[in-house]
Amino acid sequence: MTVTLADTVQEEEPHFEDEQILARKYIETLYDKVKILDTTFIINGLTYDIKCRHFCKKDNGLTIPKKYNPDIKKDFKTNNFATKLTITIGKNIILNKTIEKSDFKNHLDTTLNRYATLLFPYISLTNDTISVNYSISIPGTDVGRAFSFRIGKDGHFVVNGM
């Protein structure tokens, strides 16, 4: 039996436009979901209780220009996201804050300041520092950067690019 090129199955690579459509649809599924990241750590006898709620602000606060949406050739209206974070050590609340894109504004370029939002949070702990890590990205695109909101055990925080 001879196999020819016509007999083989050829898989198409996904089109960039298809990926963008899926990415926008995924972002839209997050509008009504609250991501809950609650955890407890015990380090050197201290109990760290972290309550984190990442949510859509439903503010229609972002208009992504059509140049970032070549498949639909029009602007994409979407929402900002934010994180409500409460950290307790023992019985003391050391931080009770809503984290928003504005907390990172001094570290963002003009494009991310205008069109990006906080996406895909996760929590990490290194020594006595709690980090809430994000992708600050333009929804529906691969344009963005990783950032970290780091909190010390005294409740003071700093913002870092990763």
Where are these regions (language model features)?
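Extracytoplasmic electrostatic interaction patches
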Residues: I94-M162
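Surface-exposed acidic loop/strand-edge motifs in secreted or periplasmic proteins
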Residues: L5-L119
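Bacterial signal peptide processing site
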Residues: M1-T2
